[in-house]
Regions:
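Conserved C-terminal helix/tail region of periplasmic/extracytoplasmic solute-binding proteins
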Residues: 5-7, 372-411
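Extracytoplasmic ligand-binding site segments that recognize negatively charged/polar headgroups
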Residues: 82, 109-258
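Mature extracytoplasmic/periplasmic domains
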Residues: 302, 306-381
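Early extracytoplasmic/lumenal segment of secretory-pathway proteins
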Residues: 41-111
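Alpha-to-beta junction loops
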Residues: 90-99, 113-114, 193-195, 265-270
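N-terminal secretory signal peptides
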Residues: 1-15, 25
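Extracytoplasmic/periplasmic substrate-binding proteins
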Residues: 248-309, 346-353
């Protein structure tokens, strides 16, 4: 992939996610909410203008919210996080809510571009998962999602209301690579697979994975791969450059279709992958699996942040509360992500919930390559949550990391 294509890869991913999301959302619309439906009254004079990735900014979801909330208008723009962050820092007033990712919150909090949302204003908040309210002793609080989203330790106001999260890993071809070989981040850099591995073009992803691998190989000892210091960034950059020059990578991928095609063809047999991409390869009738890396998963969460000065704050709160109910939670779950609320259990078909969340066998007709008796790769949500290496976070040495990433791209 050329540098120009790397800079523009997000567009193709958005196109895919828009189409995939529309299908999933379509299945969700019309699901009864029962006691979980809860909105502020008197929204008829409000509108909801949102911006974010197409993972969450989906037309069918917005239309369903409009119908159920009574807001007079909704609009959504799909764009990548850096672009929106630049717009916000420049002072745009075009949006009411940014559907952002936890790791980017520090930049907009420090510049007063977002305002917190009170949990007391959301009737569905009571069923949020412990992941977002209780710190895991495995990491410092600030290095996990619970330390990113709250205004303070009273946990009464949120900088970001979580709506989607997942644990990312390695996608591989089990007919060409054994499960044992693929069960480590070092596999992406193993000479045995020279010319047949793929590396994501997002620098925060690539550097974290390189650090995970180097830790496993005894080349580094970085306790928090999501926030390496300058010296560790320098070593990881040297490692990445040497692998690139040796021809280790079949592709520096960012385009969803490219990833799927390369894995399906066997030109690339290992890659750091999005789980929906692995499903897309399986849907073509090819063997493809999401690995359980011994070093652990990369964890992340997307959610709603209210933009400071919005004239539609009540609509933002209602939209955030809506995300903690049935239809949107079902839509993202059937794409292969997780909903942060336990409300999903009563809203989703019980057999589908059992497959996506509880590690139970698939029941019913084949769907996107998932056949009767298949299990979700990695097992249940509980099992996967216990195997997280680190949560994505904003690195202290972000500028230095980006400088070294540019050197890698130019090598």
């Amino acid at each position: 992939m050329s540098i120009d294509r790397i800079k523009n890869y997000h567009l193709s991913r958005r196109k895919f996610l828009a189409s995939a999301g529309a299908g999933a959302a379509g299945m969700a619309v019309g699901v009864p909410w029962g006691a979980q439906q809860a909105f502020a009254a008197g929204l008829g004079d409000k509108e909801l203008r949102t911006v974010g990735l197409s993972v969450t900014v989906q037309e069918r979801i917005l239309n369903d919210f409009k119908a159920k909330s009574g807001v007079k208008a909704v609009s959504g723009k799909a764009d990548i996080f850096p672009n929106t962050q630049t717009e916000l820092l420049a002072g745009t007033s075009a949006y009411d809510v940014w559907e952002t990712i936890g790791e980017r919150l520090p930049a907009v909090i420090a510049t007063n571009k977002i305002t917190p949302i009170a949990t007391s204003a959301m009737k569905n908040w009571g069923n949020i998962r412990d992941t977002f309210t209780k710190a895991d002793p495995k990491w410092d609080k600030k290095n996990q999602i619970v330390g990113q989203i709250w205004k303070d330790d009273t946990q009464k106001e949120l900088w970001m209301v979580p709506t989607v999260y997942n644990y990312d890993s390695i996608g591989y071809r089990p007919d060409l690579v054994s499960a044992e070989e693929a069960s480590t981040w070092t596999a992406l850099f193993d000479k045995k697979f020279k010319g047949k591995t793929g590396l994501n073009v997002d620098p925060l992803i690539a550097f974290g994975e390189a650090v995970l691998a180097m830790n496993a190989l005894g080349l580094l000892k970085v306790p928090n791969p999501g926030n390496p210091d300058k010296a560790s960034i320098d070593e990881a950059a040297k490692f990445l450059v040497s692998k690139k020059k040796d021809g280790q990578f079949r592709a520096l991928w960012g385009d969803f279709g490219e990833l799927v095609n390369l894995l399906a063809s066997g030109e690339m047999i290992l890659a750091d992958a999005w789980q929906p991409a692995v499903m897309a390869v399986k849907a073509q009738g090819k063997q493809c699996t999401y690995a359980v890396a011994k070093e652990g998963y990369r964890a992340w969460s997307i959610g709603n942040s209210a933009i400071t000065g919005t004239p539609n704050m009540d609509a933002v709160v209602a939209y955030s509360d809506y995300w903690l109910s049935g239809p949107p939670a079902i839509a993202v779950s059937e794409q292969g992500y997780y909903s942060p609320t336990t409300n999903i259990k009563s809203a989703m078909d019980k057999d589908k919930y059992a497959f996506w969340y509880e590690g139970k066998p698939w029941k019913g007709a084949t769907d996107r390559g998932i056949k009767e008796g298949d299990l979700r790769d990695g097992g249940s949500l509980e099992t996967r949550a216990k195997n997280v290496a680190y949560w994505h976070q904003w690195p202290d040495e972000y500028d230095h990391l980006i400088k070294k990433w540019d050197e890698f791209l130019s090598a």
